Design a protein with these regions (language model features):
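Glycine-rich loop-to-alpha-helix module at the N-terminal edge of alpha/beta enzyme cores
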Residues: 1-65
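Residue-level signal for inorganic ion chemistry
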Residues: 10, 32, 54, 116, ...
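Short gly/ser/thr-rich secondary-structure transition/capping motifs
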Residues: 70-78, 150-153, 215-216
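Conserved small-residue-rich beta-alpha loop and adjacent elements
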Residues: 70-144
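ALDH superfamily catalytic-core signature
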Residues: 169, 177-225
Length: 225
């Protein structure tokens, strides 16, 4: 199972995933552009970011340190030491949005692998194909069977993941109302929420207005080509 893999084995898997994605990066980029409608230039940049994310996770997979604590602050524990170790939490559910269909998926999958946790991934209904391509890379890299399950579901059916007691942590990226509803319904599960977006633009009176206009137009419409 995933929890029995050593740190160096998890690191090796993550590096293989990154290498496999790099070999297929044009396939990823074109799939992303076709299913999400993102311009190919932006799609290629996003794929590079996802590849980088798996490389970072590979490095971090060997840095999950514990602690050794002296217990000599009471007489009867003098000469004794406490050891703190970290263990995989268990099955994780990842729920991702449509706007960055490989980067935000990588942000869920890579840390789960680094920590030794199996994942059930629900990609956005509009953009499941990049996640399925990634699952191929993960399987070919040697991650145990069943360690990553990509399940294209409707948003309504995703509630089954929230209520399933086998899931120990839910990682959600999406809207504020849905995120807080997940937290409310999650019970004792741990929840990680990345909600909404604060994309305000402030142009000061002494700014270069030509530059500001160019950046505002780019930021507002880049996704549309």
């Amino acid at each position: 199972t995933t929890r029995r893999l050593t740190a160096f084995e998890r690191q090796r898997v993550l590096r293989r995933i990154s290498a496999s994605m790099a070999e297929r990066k044009e396939e990823f980029a074109r799939t992303l552009a076709q299913e999400a409608g993102k311009p190919i230039k932006g799609a290629r940049t996003e794929v590079e970011r996802a590849i980088f994310t798996f490389n970072v996770a590979a490095e971090e997979s060997t840095r999950s340190y514990g602690e050794v604590l002296p217990l000599d602050w009471q007489e009867f524990t003098a000469g004794r030491w406490g050891i703190v170790r970290r263990f995989p939490l268990g099955p994780v559910a990842g729920i991702t949005p449509f706007n960055f269909p490989i980067t935000l998926v990588a942000h869920k999958v890579a840390p789960a692998i680094a920590a030794g946790c199996p994942m059930v991934l629900k990609p956005a209904p509009q953009t499941p194909l990049c996640s399925l391509l990634l699952a191929e890379c993960v399987q070919q890299a040697g991650w145990p069977d069943g360690g990553l399950n990509v399940i294209p579901l409707s948003n309504e059916d995703a509630g089954l993941l929230v209520s399933d007691d086998r899931i120990k942590l839910i990682s959600f990226t999406g809207s504020v109302p849905v995120g807080w509803d997940i937290k409310r319904r999650a019970g004792k599960k741990k929840v990680v929420l990345e909600l909404g977006g604060n994309a305000a633009v402030i142009v000061h009176s002494d700014a270069d207005l030509s530059y500001a206009v160019d950046r505002c137009v780019t930021g507002g419409f880049a996704y549309a080509g």
